[in-house]
């Protein structure tokens, strides 16, 4: 049996934030959720999350699962105290207890599984992940003999000689609960910080093993925003490398960010300063960017998106969008359509080969195939209290600077005169003009007063 305890009670003072440290995000997921996800792959019987600072916010952030339980540590007196609090909940547990911090977002399930296997193979009381760091500043030092841990000294308690040791404590433990439960409540706060350290269990347990792994970045804990940024860069490098090896070209990968959930097809070209977020799906032979932002969008084959933003919409094949277009949620742009300069579309369906080339707003609308929307067209869909639908049939031509006052229905092959304000429905094959008659006054003299 395996129980997991994730320590997430701390404030994270060095983050200089109103947000609990474990709720800061990497590539769209909180630090804590990333740790939970890795632990879930081990299929533990239970995961206990030890919370404290802003505990309600932390609990609400976690994706609910029947094997996840929360325990409040109040006050927070250190890592050892957290497990003392936990011990009141798991008195009859049999098997292993894995303990890790909620701020190691890059930890892999494979590494955790290897730790458990190592621990079981040694019949250890405790096994601890360790690594050698070129710069061990901020980490507790681990002192071993024949792979058995003699002691761990927190950096704040290290003397000069102890600080020179490069073997560090990653803060990830696998305990035999049967043995740990006998000594956990004997821990004292005999240190400079007046905290109860979990590391003090090492001297009280007989078979304490070091499980040394290569420091490849996955053990990085997050204590400040510099480290947060470094981890973000690590994640993004891995994501983009995977896509490049899978057939995607990045013109300037360092300037782009891609969510882990996004799927990108073959021969897609991602230009500089492009960001693809959420559950986006981009099919083969598309060109995205430069300077584009796409979130939760489906983009079919052979599309071109330039300097534009697309949210939660579906773009069919051979569509060209941009530059400077904004596709807001709940839009569907059908095949071979063209959305051009400074166009905003919201909650609308455009049938195939529709052209909206310039300076237009299309909201809460349905536009039939082969229709051309002239420059400056506005669908006036909001009366200050309620939004209304605009329907435009196929093969229509909407003149420049037309305002369509919704609710309104234009049939097939309707033409509107440039500058018109259309307030009434128009039937098929009609011309709709609604504008003031031009008056020319000769010999006009401007009043200079």
From Swiss-Prot:
GO terms for cellular component: carboxysome; cytoplasm; membrane. SUPFAM superfamilies: Nucleotide-diphospho-sugar transferases, Trimeric LpxA-like enzymes. In the N-terminal section; belongs to the N-acetylglucosamine-1-phosphate uridyltransferase family. In the C-terminal section; belongs to the transferase hexapeptide repeat family. Its EC number is 2.7.7.23, 2.3.1.157. Pathway: Nucleotide-sugar biosynthesis; UDP-N-acetyl-alpha-D-glucosamine biosynthesis; N-acetyl-alpha-D-glucosamine 1-phosphate from alpha-D-glucosamine 6-phosphate (route II): step 2/2; Nucleotide-sugar biosynthesis; UDP-N-acetyl-alpha-D-glucosamine biosynthesis; UDP-N-acetyl-alpha-D-glucosamine from N-acetyl-alpha-D-glucosamine 1-phosphate: step 1/1; Bacterial outer membrane biogenesis; LPS lipid A biosynthesis. The lineage of its organism: Bacteria, Bacillati, Cyanobacteriota, Cyanophyceae, Synechococcales. It catalyses: alpha-D-glucosamine 1-phosphate + acetyl-CoA = N-acetyl-alpha-D-glucosamine 1-phosphate + CoA + H(+); N-acetyl-alpha-D-glucosamine 1-phosphate + UTP + H(+) = UDP-N-acetyl-alpha-D-glucosamine + diphosphate. Binds 1 Mg(2+) ion per subunit. The active site is at 358 (proton acceptor). Mg(2+) binds at residues 103, 223. Acetyl-CoA binds at residues 375, 418, 435. Keywords: Acyltransferase, Cell shape, Cell wall biogenesis/degradation, Cytoplasm, Magnesium, Metal-binding, Multifunctional enzyme, Nucleotidyltransferase, Peptidoglycan synthesis, Repeat, Transferase. One of its GO terms (biological process) is regulation of cell shape. UDP-N-acetyl-alpha-D-glucosamine binds at residues 7-10, 21, 73, 78-79, 140, 154, 169, 223, 328, 346, 361, 372. InterPro entries: Bifunctional_GlmU (IPR005882), GlmU-like (IPR050065), GlmU_C_LbH (IPR038009), Hexapep (IPR001451), MobA-like_NTP_Trfase (IPR025877), Nucleotide-diphossugar_trans (IPR029044), Trimer_LpxA-like_sf (IPR011004). It is an enzyme of class 2 (transferase). This is Bifunctional protein GlmU. Catalyzes the last two sequential reactions in the de novo biosynthetic pathway for UDP-N-acetylglucosamine (UDP-GlcNAc). The C-terminal domain catalyzes the transfer of acetyl group from acetyl coenzyme A to glucosamine-1-phosphate (GlcN-1-P) to produce N-acetylglucosamine-1-phosphate (GlcNAc-1-P), which is converted into UDP-GlcNAc by the transfer of uridine 5-monophosphate (from uridine 5-triphosphate), a reaction catalyzed by the N-terminal domain.
């Amino acid at each position: 049996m395996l129980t997991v305890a994730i320590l997430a009670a701390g404030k994270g003072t060095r983050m200089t934030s109103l947000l609990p440290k474990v709720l800061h995000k990497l590539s769209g997921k909180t630090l804590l959720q990333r740790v939970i996800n890795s632990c879930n792959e081990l299929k533990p019987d239970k995961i206990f999350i030890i919370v404290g600072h802003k505990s309600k916010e932390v609990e609400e952030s976690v994706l609910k699962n029947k094997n996840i339980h929360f325990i409040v540590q109040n006050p927070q007196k250190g890592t050892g105290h957290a497990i003392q609090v936990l011990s009141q909940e798991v008195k009859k547990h049999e098997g292993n207890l894995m303990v890790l911090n909620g701020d190691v977002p890059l930890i892999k399930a494979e590494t955790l599984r290897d730790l458990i296997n190592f621990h079981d193979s040694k019949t250890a009381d405790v096994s601890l992940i360790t690594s050698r760091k070129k710069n061990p500043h901020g980490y507790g030092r681990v002192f071993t003999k024949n792979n058995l841990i003699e002691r761990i000294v927190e950096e704040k308690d290290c003397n000069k000689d102890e600080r020179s040791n490069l073997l560090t404590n990653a803060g990830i433990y696998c305990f035999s609960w049967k043995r740990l439960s006998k000594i956990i409540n004997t821990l004292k706060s005999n240190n400079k910080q007046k905290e109860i350290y979990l590391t003090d269990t090492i001297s009280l347990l007989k078979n304490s093993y070091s499980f040394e792994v290569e420091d490849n970045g996955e053990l990085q804990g997050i204590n400040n925003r510099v480290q947060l940024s470094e981890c973000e860069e690590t994640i993004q490098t891995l994501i983009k490398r995977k896509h490049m090896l899978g057939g995607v070209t990045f013109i300037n990968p360092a300037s782009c960010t891609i969510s882990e959930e996004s799927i990108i097809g073959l021969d897609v070209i991602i230009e500089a300063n492009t960001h693809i977020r959420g559950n986006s799906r981009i099919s083969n032979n598309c060109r995205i960017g430069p300077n584009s932002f796409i979130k939760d969008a489906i983009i079919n084959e052979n599309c071109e998106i330039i300097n534009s933003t697309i949210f939660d919409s579906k773009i069919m094949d051979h569509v060209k969008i941009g530059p400077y277009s904004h596709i807001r949620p709940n839009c569907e742009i059908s095949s071979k359509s063209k959305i051009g300069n400074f166009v905003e579309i919201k909650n609308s369906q455009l049938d195939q080969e529709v052209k909206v080339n310039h300076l237009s707003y299309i909201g809460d609308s349905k536009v039939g195939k082969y229709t051309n929307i002239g420059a400056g067209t506005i669908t006036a869909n909001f009366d200050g209290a309620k939004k209304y639908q605009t329907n435009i049939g196929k093969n229509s031509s909407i003149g420049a600077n037309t305002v369509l006052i919704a609710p309104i229905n234009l049939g097939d092959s309707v033409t509107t005169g440039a500058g018109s304000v259309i307030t009434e429905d128009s039937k098929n094959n009609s011309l709709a003009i609604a504008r003031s008659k031009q008056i020319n006054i000769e010999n006009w003299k401007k009043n200079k007063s």
